[in-house]
Swiss-Prot record:
Pathway named in the protein's UniProt entry: Amino-sugar metabolism; N-acetylneuraminate degradation; D-fructose 6-phosphate from N-acetylneuraminate: step 2/5
NCBIfam families: PRK05082.1
EC number: 2.7.1.60
Keywords: ATP-binding, Carbohydrate metabolism, Kinase, Metal-binding, Nucleotide-binding, Transferase, Zinc
Coiled-coil segments: none
GO MF terms, alphabetically ordered: ATP binding; N-acylmannosamine kinase activity; zinc ion binding
Domain of life: Bacteria
The organism of origin for this protein: Escherichia coli O6:H1 (strain CFT073 / ATCC 700928 / UPEC)
Protein function: Catalyzes the phosphorylation of N-acetylmannosamine (ManNAc) to ManNAc-6-P.
Residue sites binding Zn(2+) per the record: H156, C166, C168, C173
Gene3D superfamilies: 3.30.420.40
Protein's recorded name: N-acetylmannosamine kinase
Organism phylogeny: Bacteria, Pseudomonadati, Pseudomonadota, Gammaproteobacteria, Enterobacterales
Catalytic activity, as annotated: an N-acyl-D-mannosamine + ATP = an N-acyl-D-mannosamine 6-phosphate + ADP + H(+)
Amino acid sequence: MITLAVDIGGTKISAALISDDGSFLLKKQISTPHERCPDEMTGALRLLVSEMKGTAERFAVASTGIINNGVLTALNPDNLGGLKEYPLKNIMEDITGLNGSVINDAQAAAWAEYTVLPKEICDMVFITVSTGVGGGIVVNRKLLTGVSGLAGHVGHILSGVTDTECGCGRRGCVEAVSSGRAIMGAAKNKLAGYSTKYIFELARQGYKEAEFLTERSASTIAELIVSLKLLLDCQVVVVGGSVGLADGYVQKVSKHLSIYSEICNVMLFPAYFRSDSGLIGATLWDRDCIT
């Protein structure tokens, strides 16, 4: 079976045709529309999959935001143009003429990453640090989605940094400190206006303000991991996302984790599937749903 997989993120939307053995037959990518207009998202999706839908037998979508019975709502209005009650599953059915499923992107990525962990692992957490911060949780070998799709939104757990305002309306969320958007937003003076990628490059060159921003991001993620370890007793944490997969970022997080009690130790890995975790996870989840 060939699946049309789509991953909707805060910055880009990816689509791929994925075969039964997990091979990518074709992959495309476009920028995520940020206008507060559902028609913009629908138009972008229609354009992206137009040349792929005829080859696929099902669709599988992973998207940032809350997915509740196929309906998408952005928890943080700064993401996806603040989409609310967007009937993503129905729209994909209309666009493609196919049946399929929709799941949160970090939940999907967690499921993909869990499948390649050693068989003895039954509890894990995936954290994506990208435009925003999200997560997916596997407990007793089962993915937690929650009664309303909210499970795993770890980016909106409070951090120890209280002077940052999050788009969700709270102050001090992990997302408001560690995400790519937060790093860019906090950049001042000579760093103002630079991309997160360039700020990381400046940090590697020893630029002090850049070092502070990237270290604060990593230390806040480490603090989050400790909290999740205490709550879930997870065996493994996998980190993904454009920031999470930046050169040296997981090592920074590991360094900050080392200051905590040994009881909070957890195995820490970068995402095996890199930026494709969401696409692969959505596909695997969809196939599990129909078997």
